[in-house]
From Swiss-Prot:
Biased composition (Basic and acidic residues): 978-987
Database matches in CDD domains: CAP_ED (cd00038), PAS (cd00130)
Intramembrane region ranges (chain numbering): 449-470
Phosphoserine found at: 972, 976, 979
Cytoplasmic side: 1-220, 270-290, 369-377, 499-987
GO biological process, one term: regulation of cell population proliferation
Keyword Calcium: no
Tissue expression as described in the entry: Detected in cerebellum, cortex and retina.
Record comment: activity regulation: Channel activity is inhibited by interaction with Ca(2+)-bound calmodulin. Interaction of a single pore-forming alpha subunit with a calmodulin chain is sufficient to promote channel closure. Extracellular magnesium ion concentrations up to 4 mM modulate channel activity by slowing down current activation in a reversible fashion. Channel activity is not regulated by cyclic nucleotides. Channel activity is inhibited by binding intracellular phosphatidylinositol-3,5-bisphosphate and phosphatidylinositol-4,5-bisphosphate (PIP2), but is not inhibited by phosphatidylinositol 4-phosphate.
Keyword Nucleotide-binding: no
Descriptive protein name: Voltage-gated delayed rectifier potassium channel KCNH1
Function statement: Pore-forming (alpha) subunit of a voltage-gated delayed rectifier potassium channel that mediates outward-rectifying potassium currents which, on depolarization, reaches a steady-state level and do not inactivate. The activation kinetics depend on the prepulse potential and external divalent cation concentration. With negative prepulses, the current activation is delayed and slowed down several fold, whereas more positive prepulses speed up activation. The time course of activation is biphasic with a fast and a slowly activating current component.
Top-level lineage group: Eukaryota
Species this chain originates from: Bos taurus
């Protein structure tokens, strides 16, 4: 007895895309590629393509859908580019292209490419079909044969192609048409709009097909049940009591009932049914064939209009023998003439054919599982069956009495008939009307006779028997015995063992409903989400439909070990026959493996593996289809015959799944655990080598596929172009980052001022361009001041007369620095050495740049531009300005002045007096040593400053997100070149 889920069938939404493509393709060779991953990797290839190309399915998985791995030296480059453009533009197109098989045999293919869309109208897959057209193309290699040679070559090619097609053709059952044409090519020619979509959808039915579990069909079945009982009651009554439908109302009612049953036959040709595997069959052809083979003939015979045939009989002739319509028909009649008896026989024949209508009870029998799902309905049906049996027995009991009351030999009434006794008891005896109609009249009415007959059969069936109506003749006694026997059986079966019947017949159903109630209570108690609850309920229904409530493990435990192993081999026979890895296994090895296999049933949407879970099982797909999802992209579609998991026999560690494996349809998987498989392989060493060599995983969950999405590539390209076209980032003068730089500069100036208090100021300032040299005892006519700095310099000459008498130095100073020379602090400056003097010079340079700092931001670009035009500039190195100004230390003793070498003003020349060489070398070494130490300290500080700046910029960016990007990242020019060097000099 089937339960509600089995009666309804498996109706959960499924992704039947792969099944639809395979069903439509027949002998077509095709591959499926992911349209959302770079290079469009292959996620599925059918057996036809594998045999045509020579590659195994595992070898072509994840390769490009353009089949670039099959290109060769003779493949046309333009066609390759057209194929790639078709993929990039998501178009439908077809090409003729020369490609190479795995053994490098060149073959001409006719390739058709079609995009597959999902429910969001987004292209997610590419369908590529391949047809071998080598026989219809020019020979690839030079062939000298002509004429009949070409014809022979063409014939040979066509013959081989037909042989391949016959090999690729699936096995068909006996009587099935083998020569099926592929519908996939026709679909591709019509366009991509009618291609199946890759999405979850409920089982679809054609518009003229009715679901057997819909509300309309359920209501119709209950109406048919009521009309069937109506037929089962009236047909025996009309046949037994020989009533003629002279009443037009009854004739119309019976005709309407016949029409309804004819309509039911038509509906049965358009109603789905549940297949042997629990699936809903909605194919019109299969529905028609199934109905014609089962109940069509019986339903047709039960719907013939027998009342209409009887209506055309001679009503007057028949009425002559009927007598009073309120009395019984033939029990009180004189024997009719011969021709009347013949007409009566024909009428009785058609009346007897009404019994065929009782075949309508077959509708109740085949739909009994629809009605017994409800306890009250079962009880009502049982009572109705008992009452219907009593009704039939009453009709037969009256027919016996009607036959026995008239004596054919003496033409008299038998007074030992139960009808005669009934007539005498109720005071309506039979009387012969000799002067009138010449017939027997009187007797009990039909209603009294039927009620009395039903009373007698009921008392006999229940074994009560009051005795007021008793059989008298031999035939009546025999029938009474039969009634008692049948009654005892019915009474004991229906009333005495109702509980036992329910327990035996509906034990699985009760267990099924008990389990469903427990699951519903559990889901309600723990408030499981609605979507997950529906998945759980659908899984339970589908699993029960497949197993019929039978506990396989419990049954196997009952059987002995040898028998259990044989059963397991039979249950896993599909895996052992389809995969070559098991061909060399011995019987003992197969039995050991079969004992370890488990059968798993999965509903649509179930996840077999989650990403990150341990892969501890090897799974073989027996039926259904699954998808492998990595990073929200479908990287593989698995179907019948595929294997996924991990190569346990080659890896020492337990793998983690790199992808999700989700069922698209109802799937049956045969699973073997890692430990169990390794145990068998360790024991059967010879088989282990063959198994590891021949078993090829369609998808290895241990390996992660590295790919780039086309959408990511496009987004990166757009961002790169956007950054390329963006304006330079500029900070406004009052920006917090700008203020932060000024604050760092002020702290540095304060630190330098503190260090300057204890050092000498009279040392050479190489970086600022001021060099102090001692004169020799030779008198000179004049002294020169040469300015070496980033701004344009102007040499200022002092005549000898204007210089003090005790002047021993020639000073190189900046313009306008006459009043900025050493003053009262000269004694402190004399104590300072090396790099301290350079720092002091830096401080003086800051004083010199007061004018530039006072300038507005509007005049800053012009001054910077003028400074950029200077011939002599300060570099980023720590070398002195002397070397940059071409004042070489090895030439200081020459008699010419430094203006001879100065690039500033060549026309103004001044004398340059030599200084002691050892003093300069000592100063330079000291400067070099201090520079190294300061550079290290500055590098450390700049590293920490950069980290702080990065954090500050991140905070400011988040706080000022409401501002425009141009305002946020706008950087203004520094206030002066010196401040810019102070901040960014170390970088």
């Amino acid at each position: 007895m089937t339960m509600a889920g089995g009666r309804k069938g498996l109706v959960a939404p499924q992704n039947t895309f792969l099944e639809n493509i395979v069903r439509r393709s027949n002998d077509t060779n095709f591959v499926l590629g992911n349209a959302q991953i770079v290079d469009w990797p292959i996620v599925y290839s059918n057996d036809g393509f594998c045999k045509l190309s020579g590659y195994h399915r595992a070898e072509v998985m994840q390769k490009s859908s353009t089949c670039s791995f099959m290109y060769g030296e003779l493949t046309d480059k333009d066609t390759i580019e057209k194929v790639r453009q078709t993929f990039e533009n998501y178009e439908m197109n077809s090409f003729e292209i020369l490609m190479y098989k795995k053994n490098r045999t060149p073959v001409w293919f006719f390739v058709k490419i079609a995009p597959i869309r999902n429910e969001q109208d987004k292209v997610v897959l590419f369908l590529c079909t391949f047809s071998d057209i080598t026989a219809f193309k020019q020979p690839i290699e030079d062939d000298s044969c002509k004429g009949w040679g070409k014809f022979a070559r063409l014939t040979r090619a066509l013959t081989s192609s037909r042989g391949v097609l016959q090999q690729l053709a699936p096995s068909v059952q006996k009587g099935e048409n083998v020569h099926k044409h592929s519908r996939l090519a026709e679909v591709l020619q019509l366009g991509s709009d009618i291609l199946p979509q890759y999405k979850q959808e409920a089982p679809k039915t054609p518009p003229h097909i009715i679901l057997h579990y819909c509300v309309f069909k359920t209501t119709w079945d209950w109406i048919i049940l009521i009309l069937t009982f109506y037929t089962a009651i009236l047909v025996p009554y009309n046949v037994s009591f020989k009533t003629r439908q002279n009443n037009v109302a009854w004739l119309v009612v019976d005709s309407i009932v016949d029409v309804i049953f004819l309509v039911d036959i038509v509906l049965n040709f358009h109603t789905t049914f549940v297949g042997p595997a629990g699936e809903v069959i909605s194919d019109p052809k299969l529905i028609r064939m199934n109905y014609l083979k089962t109940w069509f003939v019986i339903d047709l015979l039960s719907c013939l209009p027998y009342d209409v045939i009887n209506a055309f009989e001679n009503v007057d002739e028949v009425s002559a023998f009927m007598g009073d319509p309120g009395k019984i028909g033939f029990a009180d009649q004189i024997p009719p003439p011969l021709e009347g008896r013949e007409s009566q026989g024909i009428s009785s024949l058609f009346s007897s054919l009404k019994v065929v209508r009782l075949l309508r009870l077959g509708r109740v029998a085949r739909k009994l599982d629809h009605y017994i799902e409800y306890g009250a309905a079962v009880l009502v049906l049982l009572v109705c069956v008992f009452g219907l049996a009593a009704h039939w027995m009453a009709c037969i009991w009256y027919s016996i009495g009607d036959y026995e009351i008239f004596d054919e030999d003496t033409k008299t009434i038998r007074n030992n008939s139960w009808l005669y006794q009934l007539a005498m008891d109720i005071g309506t005896p039979y009387q012969f009307n000799g002067s009138g109609s010449g017939k027997w009249e009187g007797g009990p009415s039909k209603n009294s006779v039927y009620i009395s007959s039903l009373y007698f059969t009921m008392t006999s069936l229940t074994s009560v028997g009051f005795g007021n109506i008793a059989p008298s003749t031999d035939i009546e006694k025999i029938f009474a015995v039969a009634i008692m026997m049948i009654g005892s059986l019915l009474y004991a079966t229906i009333f005495g063992n109702v509980t036992t019947i329910f327990q035996q017949m509906y034990a699985n159903t009760n267990r099924y409903h008990e389990m469903l109630n427990s699951v519903r209570d559990f889901l309600k108690l723990y408030q499981v989400p609605k979507g997950l609850s529906e998945r759980v309920m659908d899984y339970i229904v589908s699993t029960w439909s497949m197993s019929r409530g039978i506990d396989t493990e419990k049954v196997l435990q009952i059987c002995p070990k040898d028998m259990r192993a044989d059963i397991c081999v039979h249950l896993n026979r599909k895996v052992f026959k389809e995969h070559p890895a098991f061909r060399l296994a011995s019987d003992g090895c197969l039995r050991a493996l079969a004992m370890e296999f488990q059968t798993v049933h999965c509903a649509p949407g179930d996840l077999i593996y989650h990403a990150g879970e341990s892969v501890d099982s090897l799974c073989f797909v027996v039926s259904g289809s699954l998808e492998v999802i990595q990073d929200d992209e479908v990287v593989a579609i698995l179907g019948k015959g595929d294997v996924f998991g991990d190569v346990f026999w080659k890896e020492a560690t337990l793998a983690q799944s790199c992808a999700n494996v989700r069922a698209l349809t109802y799937c049956d998987l045969h699973v073997i655990k890692r430990d169990a498989l390794q145990k068998v392989l360790e024991f059967y060493t010879a088989f282990s080598h063959s198994f590891s060599r021949n078993l090829i995983l369609t998808y290895n969950l241990r390996k992660r596929i590295v790919f780039r999405k086309i959408s990511d590539v496009k987004r990166e390209e757009e961002e790169r172009m956007k950054r390329k076209n963006e304006a330079p980032l500029i900070l406004p003068p009052d920006h917090p980052v700008r203020r932060l730089f000024q604050r760092f500069r002020q702290q540095k100036e304060a630190r330098l001022a503190a260090e300057r208090g204890g050092r000498d100021l009279d040392d050479l300032d190489v970086e600022k361009g001021s060099v102090l040299t001692e004169h020799s005892h030779h008198g000179l006519a004049k002294a020169s001041v040469v300015t070496v700095r980033e701004s344009p310099a102007t040499p200022v000459a002092f005549p000898a007369a204007a210089a003090p008498a005790g002047l021993d130095h020639a000073r190189l100073q900046a313009p306008g620095a006459e009043g900025l020379g050493p003053k009262a602090g000269g004694a402190d400056c004399a104590k300072r050495k090396g790099w301290a003097r350079f720092k002091d010079a830096c401080g003086q340079a800051e004083d010199w740049s007061k004018v530039s700092k006072a300038e507005s931001m509007e005049t800053l670009p012009e001054r910077t531009k003028a400074a950029g035009e200077a011939t002599l500039k300060k570099t980023d190195s720590c070398d002195s300005g002397i070397t940059k100004s071409d004042l070489r230390l090895d030439n200081v003793g020459e008699a010419r002045s430094p203006q001879d070498r100065s690039p500033i003003l060549a026309e103004v020349k001044h004398s340059f007096y030599p200084i002691p060489e050892q003093t300069l070398q000592a100063a330079v070494l000291e400067v070099k040593h201090e520079l190294k130490e300061d550079i290290k300290a500055l590098s450390t500080k700049m590293t920490s400053i950069e980290k702080q700046l990065s954090e500050i910029l991140r905070i400011l960016t988040s706080r000022r997100s409401s501002q425009s990007p141009q305002e946020l990242f706008e950087i203004s020019r520094p206030q002066s070149p010196e401040s810019e060097r102070d901040i960014f000099g170390a970088s």
